[in-house]
Amino acid sequence: MANDSPAKSLVDIDLSSLRDPAGIFELVEVVGNGTYGQVYKGRHVKTGQLAAIKVMDVTEDEEEEIKLEINMLKKYSHHRNIATYYGAFIKKSPPGHDDQLWLVMEFCGAGSITDLVKNTKGNTLKEDWIAYISREILRGLAHLHIHHVIHRDIKGQNVLLTENAEVKLVDFGVSAQLDRTVGRRNTFIGTPYWMAPEVIACDENPDATYDYRSDLWSCGITAIEMAEGAPPLCDMHPMRALFLIPRNPPPRLKSKKWSKKFFSFIEGCLVKNYMQRPSTEQLLKHPFIRDQPNERQVRIQLKDHIDRTRKKRGEKDETEYEYSGSEEEEEEVPEQEGEPSSIVNVPGESTLRRDFLRLQQENKERSEALRRQQLLQEQQLREQEEYKRQLLAERQKRIEQQKEQRRRLEEQQRREREARRQQEREQRRREQEEKRRLEELERRRKEEEERRRAEEEKRRVEREQEYIRRQLEEEQRHLEVLQQQLLQEQAMLLECRWREMEEHRQAERLQRQLQQEQAYLLSLQHDHRRPHPQHSQQPPPPQQERSKPSFHAPEPKAHYEPADRAREVEDRFRKTNHSSPEAQSKQTGRVLEPPVPSRSESFSNGNSESVHPALQRPAEPQVPVRTTSRSPVLSRRDSPLQGSGQQNSQAGQRNSTSIEPRLLWERVEKLVPRPGSGSSSGSSNSGSQPGSHPGSQSGSGERFRVRSSSKSEGSPSQRLENAVKKPEDKKEVFRPLKPADLTALAKELRAVEDVRPPHKVTDYSSSSEESGTTDEEDDDVEQEGADESTSGPEDTRAASSLNLSNGETESVKTMIVHDDVESEPAMTPSKEGTLIVRQTQSASSTLQKHKSSSSFTPFIDPRLLQISPSSGTTVTSVVGFSCDGMRPEAIRQDPTRKGSVVNVNPTNTRPQSDTPEIRKYKKRFNSEILCAALWGVNLLVGTESGLMLLDRSGQGKVYPLINRRRFQQMDVLEGLNVLVTISGKKDKLRVYYLSWLRNKILHNDPEVEKKQGWTTVGDLEGCVHYKVVKYERIKFLVIALKSSVEVYAWAPKPYHKFMAFKSFGELVHKPLLVDLTVEEGQRLKVIYGSCAGFHAVDVDSGSVYDIYLPTHIQCSIKPHAIIILPNTDGMELLVCYEDEGVYVNTYGRITKDVVLQWGEMPTSVAYIRSNQTMGWGEKAIEIRSVETGHLDGVFMHKRAQRLKFLCERNDKVFFASVRSGGSSQVYFMTLGRTSLLSW
């Protein structure tokens, strides 16, 4: 142990007797900070010679430390490798203020080693430069160590260079002398990254000690700093580095380019056990230090480099230097002048030193003369000797007392250490018991949680099995009903054919009777030809007529009865169903199946309450437990009847007043009353003239089934009542064409149920078009040319005016796509539009179509489909526009007029700014767009081959910033002036400076161009994903690597970079997606997704556990997003994977009995600020509520395409589409600031 009491010789230093610096030195500017004061560049007034002046306030508390520093500098600064101490002055202050002490030292104008490394290309010095500087450092340390002084703060900033490339050690503010008897210290002082393990151990263990060899560890770290630009662990937080240095193996040089001598020197300096570390003299004999043949050339190179650096830096970037004195104290030792500096001084320096020595000598002579004069006057020689003997006796007595006191103190400290060790052992025992108790509680809790989770899983499986069983029973009942109806149909068909055969036989029988009667009449005529009197030409006698009643009575009708009856049946049937194919079949004696209309040629037959009450049912609310985007609005592109429209096109070319299908069964969830001028859809069945309203039947875009008619007897309402199921079944049942279609029909019936089951629905009914022809049909239109025919007045009225069941109209929010060509209004119906209506309070409804070349179809709001009728009628969710009787050429439009906008808003009830819009930029990128981030209003775009800036504020120009580097992910942090990226072939985490990127565009700052524009975060490679999380004023960066997760935190000035915070390695499941949540503002948890599910890591304890594992999926999954739900204190999450999403909390418990179900497998899922989530699929873009998972909106694609989410801000969402061939374009969607609340 060292003696911590001040040295007695320091009492002799009288600060008040020092001279005032006024007129001798003047301060020029501040150049740095020392341990106890600021360092100025000063100038000698008379000679102009520069000096370093350390200015300190003299307080009572720090007076002893200042004396120690003066003593240390005075005694040990006279060496060529230590900054020379010139003298001290006192600047008096007014009463009430502390005096200022000026310490004048040698000025080193070339700066520190740290400045030299920073101003060198690549931030690394040559190996022979490092050897020369290390040797000079060791020589200075050897001088200090000989005098038992430990510097304790060796680092690059405390090693300065003169203009002649000489190396000087400075800052004795933390140095101390060793006790000569013990030789070790145990105080915790130094800079973290350069600190030796034994010095760090003193902070944790009071019994730990160290000696002068701790300076040699710091010398080795300084050598690494010169070789690599920074000390090891510099990316870590300082407290983290203090934790790792004693536990990690000794650091080594990373690069293999250095010589074996250099590696050996580093190994010698960095020995963790300081007792085995070589001494200073041994390291000076090391080959790396000893063998320096070209020392003169090295000094010349260093001097030239220093001169070049000073010219570049100029006056504005002066180097900061740190000078200070010692902190510790020691007993008095004989004062030594020390060896004078052996360096060649700059002219003027020797004069300055002689002036100081002369001033000090004069002061000393004057004080000695006064003392001699006083001693001669007051005391005699005998009294002096007596006084000296008394002093010696007292001193001896005092020494004995100090020894006894020290012995007692050491004994007391030993007892205290024993008591402390006992307490620590007891505390460790209690902690182990507490730890075991907590582990037991945790084990029990986990067992209880596992048991509860297993029970919940078992109950869930049972519920699913019960639900599936009920579904199968329901489907079985549906199938039985359909089979029963099929048997009834077949029975009716057989009965019809039997009756036709009876009629045919009756007609043949009547024909034979007629022939017999004709033969009989011929015979009578033959008899009448004979000559008779006039009265003999009367009719035959009555008894003869009565003998043949069956031949004579029906004579006027016998020949015409079958044809007349067929005409009556045809007329009666034409009045009810507007079609007559079956009536024509009566004359041929067989049943014909009418042609099946295509989607663009037919409307469904809406029936009113007055005619067919069996078809009416209350509208059911559409609130599925598992939400999907399937709705009746979305038509099937793969409909088996799609192709039949061209085969039956002849039926569409006939006159609409005479040839329409007899009865159409439409497969939709609800039936709509089709209004017309003066007639309804119900009256078209009951009282209207045949063919009077050919546009009065609505087509939904779903597949149709056509029922064959067998005979003309019976009203249409009776046939409908037999065909439709009971009202309490809550769904329509449709007649199939043939028994082979029963399976498909049962599947279709399940698809249109109002309440969907909570399990996954496998068939997705969305398509690229909502109505009309496909892209292939568009090509047919181009080939046929402009052969168009206009529809009749009824067609125009049906397509341009819509009257709902309660006489009110609807305004529908639409999606508008702005492309290279702006939209133009047109009043003709488009072949690709689908009109969505709902009840509102507007006055009228008109139809307006726009032309566009976009790849998107109108925006669809599913809440428009959930309409409850206000009266006794039913309301449809879909109204298509086409006409049964219209020729196909009349429906097909110009292929350039492909309408993608349906706007039913005649009264302008909503401004255009509230309408969801999609725009795209004309710029096509040659390589695939992988990521993007908003920088101000402009967009930084990262692709497979580089980084570019898309100027959104100007003409849309693209500026290339970085070429030939892949950018996978990026985020702009403008407040920190950085762009965080995962980039390069090795997927490193790089941070680019925004000022450097801005200068690559503007080229207005040549200083910025010379600096390196980016840096890496640690040595991380193979980054998969990262997330920047802001909590209060702390910015965390959580990074997913191939098999680990790293957490970094932003360290402000002077570090100004991300520094390591936590690391979790060797994870069981490899992370693919990562996020960080703060539970209740206290606990940090890392949430990450893998191919097996979602997991959490407690940052404090490092424990890893599962949050949600989708066990119903056997293969690996693809996690899409981790959404931390708002207003839950970071406790509840929505995790999206595959085509599903579940609500869980951070402890793995299901919070909502709802499964978010996408309509198809999304390629990208993102959370947007409007508290919604968006999914990009190949067929559509879906917008869903984050809180409930319900579908809020759908944007359909005209053709399948792959989309990728980029970024979002406020009401704008940016995404990219990738075309075949590699080109990619940027889209942005403007949702409208208020539209999200009013959809």
UniProtKB/Swiss-Prot annotation:
Residues bearing PTM Phosphoserine: 5, 324, 326, 629, 631, 639, 644, 656, 700, 712, 715, 791, 800-801, 805, 823, 852, 855, 900, 913
Enzyme class of the recorded protein, top EC level: transferase
Region feature Disordered, mapped onto this chain: 306-349, 421-462, 517-811
Region of interest: Mediates interaction with RAP2A: 858-1212
Cited Pfam families: CNH, Pkinase
N-acetylalanine: modified positions: A2
InterPro entries: CNH_dom, Kinase-like_dom_sf, Prot_kinase_dom, Protein_kinase_ATP_BS, Ser/Thr_kinase_AS, STE20_Ser-Thr_kinase
One GO CC term, this protein: cytoplasm
Main localization category: cytoplasm
Coiled coil segments of this chain: none
Listed Gene3D superfamilies: Phosphorylase Kinase, domain 1, Transferase(Phosphotransferase) domain 1
Molecular function in Gene Ontology: ATP binding; creatine kinase activity; MAP kinase kinase kinase kinase activity; microtubule binding; protein serine kinase activity; protein serine/threonine kinase activity
Residues annotated with Phosphothreonine modification: T828
Signal peptide start-end: none
Active-site annotation: D153
Compositional bias of kind Acidic residues: 317-338, 772-787
EC number: 2.7.11.1
Compositional bias of kind Low complexity: 642-656, 675-701
Ranges of compositional bias, category Basic and acidic residues: 554-574, 663-672, 722-735, 747-762
UniProt similarity note: Belongs to the protein kinase superfamily. STE Ser/Thr protein kinase family. STE20 subfamily.
Described function: Serine/threonine kinase that plays a role in the response to environmental stress and cytokines such as TNF-alpha. Appears to act upstream of the JUN N-terminal pathway. Activator of the Hippo signaling pathway which plays a pivotal role in organ size control and tumor suppression by restricting proliferation and promoting apoptosis. MAP4Ks act in parallel to and are partially redundant with STK3/MST2 and STK4/MST2 in the phosphorylation and activation of LATS1/2, and establish MAP4Ks as components of the expanded Hippo pathway.
Subunit organization: Interacts with the SH3 domain of the adapter proteins Nck. Interacts (via its CNH regulatory domain) with ATL1 (via the N-terminal region). Interacts with RAP2A (GTP-bound form preferentially).
Name of the protein in question: Mitogen-activated protein kinase kinase kinase kinase 4
Species per Swiss-Prot/TrEMBL record: Homo sapiens
